[in-house]
Regions:
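Extended, well-ordered protein cores
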Residues: 2-468
């Protein structure tokens, strides 16, 4: 269904269309604020076009799965909020755009004092209109070790309001009437965008900023500004290793290594890299005219998505990644990054690298479809034939379900590499999903359950086509 069809279908327009408009507006704003991000988008588009030309079979798979039309749309952004009230209201804001909180991520064990969720659409149809999602992190003030600093940070955050009056009015209107009409949707996008805009003026003195940054640079990024500026946007590539190699050639300062699994024939989950965050001028509350402070937080990211893994597959992935990092003593450094890549590839060699094998071992999620041979045999297919038998007979085929979520270790690695300063070890704190959900105002959805439902729905539809 086209976006124009959605808009004319009813008085209140589709939340998916509002999300598509918001995503485009966000991209335009970020390219103006961070021109280097525009350069990154052009590089990714070039690499994708070259990849599709050289791999027509991959292009056919993407076209069949409806992934091709949305390939060059930004896939996600990220923000960090400071209070439970901000988190609860941001949930309501994203709900206007059909975005739901999916999964709980605790980044504290990886040395980042936040816990997070991803706001995204949850159906293939909605993703087809706009795949945009936002990784949203809530600062864990209880992890600030200095009591006086913790209380000061809480007081600073309590004074700010990150939403315009117009945004709050339109959120309430959408909730009251079950959506927004076309004109109000445009007003909403304009008003909501202000929450994510960059502000050069800090809300703290230079000394307060330094005290927050000394505790953790992310704490300063959350507390010291008027709102949760978007800290990165992310296009999708089909060949992240080529993008990583070409960034320095284009004058783009790339982070040290690609986060996530190694390069494979059958991509797993999510691989990410970025250009390093900009060192930007800011003004503290006690600065004189002509003086400028510095802040490092905003960057451009690239992602390459692979197949979603089952709980069994994810457990194996986590085990292998932990083993690779233990081999080099933690996250890769300039001194051992080549060794890390070699160890990662060697250790992951035990993870099957063919979709048929991953499916047979229950490691990944797949869509099912009836083949032309299967449709021709409809009505004569044995009622007790297993899915494996139907696949072996060529009556069913599988296609990998794209992983639409995130990886906490990778997210932490991206954050750490773009905040500057010395990376710290993990916080001695337990995950607290219950507290996060209380602050959010609802339970997060299970990403595993969503993939399972999607897979089973496709299987039932395919079996019906076989006359089962």
């Amino acid at each position: 269904m086209s976006v124009s069809t959605i808009a004319s279908a009813q008085h209140t327009i589709s939340p998916d269309l509002i999300r598509a408009r918001f995503s485009q507006a966000m991209s335009d704003m970020y390219q103006q604020e961070v021109p280097l991000y525009g350069d990154l988008i052009h590089l990714v588009a070039e690499v994708n076009a070259d990849f599709l030309e050289k791999h027509p079979e991959e292009a056919a798979v993407l076209a069949h799965s409806q992934e091709l039309p949305r390939l060059n749309l930004e896939r996600h952004g990220a923000i960090r909020v400071g209070t439970a009230e901000e988190l609860a209201t941001i949930r309501r804001l994203f709900a206007v755009m059909g975005m739901h909180p999916v999964a709980y991520y605790d980044l504290a064990p990886a040395g980042v004092p936040v816990h997070s969720t991803a706001f995204r659409a949850i159906t293939a149809e909605a993703m087809g209109v706009s795949p945009f999602r936002v990784f949203c992190s809530l600062l864990r003030l209880e992890l600030i070790e200095n009591t006086e600093l913790r209380e000061r940070a809480a007081a600073i955050l309590a004074k700010r309001c990150i939403f315009t009056d117009e945004a709050l009015r339109l959120i309430a209107l959408s909730e009251a009437q079950g959506g927004l009409d076309d004109a109000d949707a445009n007003r909403f996008v304009e008003a909501a965008l202000e929450t994510f805009r960059w502000h050069h003026e800090a809300t703290v003195s230079a000394a307060e900023y330094q005290a927050l940054a000394d505790q953790h640079r992310l704490i300063a990024d959350v507390v010291a500004f008027k709102g949760p500026h978007i800290n990165h946007l992310t296009p999708r590539t089909l060949d992240i290793d080529t993008v990583q190699r070409l960034m320095p050639e284009r004058g783009i300062d790339a982070k040290l290594s690609v986060e996530g699994p190694p390069q494979r024939q059958c991509a797993l989950l999510l691989r990410q890299t970025s250009f390093k965050a900009l060192n930007e001028d800011i003004r503290f509350t006690d600065q004189q005219a002509g003086e400028a402070g510095k802040h490092t937080a905003r960057f451009g990211e690239i992602e390459q998505r692979g197949v979603a893994l089952t709980a069994k597959g994810r457990a194996l992935y986590d085990q292998l990644l932990d083993e690779a990092r233990e081999k080099i003593g933690g996250a890769p450094t300039p001194a051992n990054v080549d060794t890390y890549y070699q160890e990662l590839a060697r250790i992951f060699s035990v993870f099957p690298d063919a979709h048929a094998d991953m499916h047979a071992q229950g490691l990944a999620f797949y869509h099912y479809r009836a083949t032309e041979q299967g449709k021709a045999a409809a009505g004569s297919v044995a009622a007790d034939a297993s899915v494996e038998a139907l696949l072996a007979q060529g009556l069913l085929a599988i296609e990998p379900i794209t992983y639409e979520d995130f990886l906490p270790v990778s997210a932490a690695g991206i954050f750490q590499s773009n905040l500057g300063g010395v990376e710290r070890g993990g916080y001695a704190s337990m995950s607290n999903q219950q507290l996060f959900e209380r602050d959010l105002g609802q339970a997060v959805l299970s990403e595993i359950a969503l993939y399972e439902q999607d897979s089973q729905a496709s299987l039932q539809a395919a079996l019906q086509q076989l006359g089962r």
